[in-house]
């Protein structure tokens, strides 16, 4: 007896094409008022497309989250709340969020489209950056992170792929850096490194020890991740490289980071101490903010020990300082008291 023919395949859906489908499955589709034009990025939780806003006729970056996330009610509520918070942050180094919502079972975020490469591509193309450029880029990222922390948002996934590098304005500002991937519920469904749908939030090369152990996290976990990124910009590789994921997680929790000056001769030795503090296993032993970390890095690059200030510039035309300075000149007549004292 001949078996019956198999049933026809189900019609294609957004769920089938989002996490693992072909790159072009959604190209040309309209989603929530946006015309999808091209895929520009893909991760474990989302896919990012270049799309055209059909209402305002502008190009945006449209991030579509994995469909299973939309089926979690708590996740959807947090997504809505945190997307609104992210959209309210007006900062020159944070990619603006235009809109976030849900359509046809998909959660989406529409953001400014930034022309340029991310830091991952930049490092792969050019190799390690010079110390001045690393400090300059790190400072812009640190400014964005601290602004987010002021709004009670912890990024949790700071990595070169989330740092966009656009053209700057002049030779003193050769690049303008944007931090992206806010508003993706990085605060998640708990205060630990895992979402309640069982997905780890973070990238293993840059993840802080407290994220691995499932402890509560705050902005200092972003200090750790930013330090991993800075070390990679200086040496060409993140602090820890291991053959398998478990060994890498162990290294973040227990192994001391390698001094960058040993990997790249010519770096000031003071840079080692700054990065060692930013990469401390305990958050209490790190810098309190990202900007304090970069300020210490800048001082180390300038040959100033931590805790000191840069020397004050003195105008040579003002003359030299004397141990017995001359008395100040008499005030003009109009500034003298009307009724002189006895």
Regions found by a protein language model. Give the residues of each.
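Activation-segment/catalytic-loop signature of the eukaryotic protein kinase fold
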Residues: 100
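C-terminal lobe helix-coil module of Hanks-type protein kinase domains
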Residues: 52, 155, 205-307
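Activation segment of protein kinases
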Residues: 22, 71-74, 166-216, 243
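AlphaC helix of the eukaryotic protein kinase fold
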Residues: 66-88
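Protein kinase glycine-rich loop
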Residues: 36-43, 48
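Protein kinase catalytic-loop region centered on the HRD/HxD motif
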Residues: 141-153
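Conserved short submotifs of the Hanks-type protein kinase catalytic core
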Residues: 104-118, 122
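Activation segment signature within eukaryotic-like protein kinase domains
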Residues: 137-138
């Amino acid at each position: 007896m001949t078996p019956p023919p198999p049933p026809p395949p189900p019609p294609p859906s957004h769920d089938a094409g989002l996490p693992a489908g072909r790159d072009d499955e959604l190209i040309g589709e309209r989603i929530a008022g946006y015309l999808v034009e091209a895929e520009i990025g893909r991760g474990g939780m989302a896919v990012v497309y270049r799309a055209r806003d059909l209402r305002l006729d502008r190009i945006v970056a449209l991030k579509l989250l994995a469909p299973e996330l939309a089926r979690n009610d708590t996740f959807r509520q947090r997504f809505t709340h945190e997307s609104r918070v992210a959209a309210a942050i007006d900062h020159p180094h944070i990619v603006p969020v235009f809109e976030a919502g849900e359509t046809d079972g998909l959660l989406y975020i529409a953001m400014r489209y930034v022309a340029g490469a991310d830091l991952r591509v930049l490092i792969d193309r050019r190799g390690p950056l010079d110390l001045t450029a690393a400090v300059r880029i790190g400072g812009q990222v640190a400014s964005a992170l601290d602004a987010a922390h002021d709004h009670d948002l912890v990024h949790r996934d700071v990595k070169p792929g989330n740092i966009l590098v656009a053209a700057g304005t002049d030779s003193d500002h050769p690049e303008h850096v944007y931090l992206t991937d806010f508003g993706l519920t990085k605060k998640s469904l708990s205060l630990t490194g895992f979402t309640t749908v069982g997905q780890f939030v973070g990238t293993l090369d840059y993840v802080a020890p407290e994220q691995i152990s499932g402890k509560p996290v705050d902005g200092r976990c972003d200090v750790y991740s930013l330090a991993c990124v800075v070390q990679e910009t200086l040496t060409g590789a993140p602090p820890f490289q291991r053959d398998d994921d478990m060994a890498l997680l162990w290294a973040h929790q227990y192994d001391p980071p390698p001094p960058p000056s040993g990997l790249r001769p010519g770096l000031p030795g003071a840079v080692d101490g700054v990065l060692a503090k930013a990469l401390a296993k305990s958050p209490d032993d790190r810098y309190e903010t990202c900007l304090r970390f970069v300020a210490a890095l800048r001082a180390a690059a300038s040959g100033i020990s931590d805790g000191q200030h840069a020397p004050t510039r003195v105008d040579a035309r003002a003359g030299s300082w004397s141990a017995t300075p001359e008395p100040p000149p008499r005030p003009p007549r109009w500034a003298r008291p009307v009724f002189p004292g006895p």
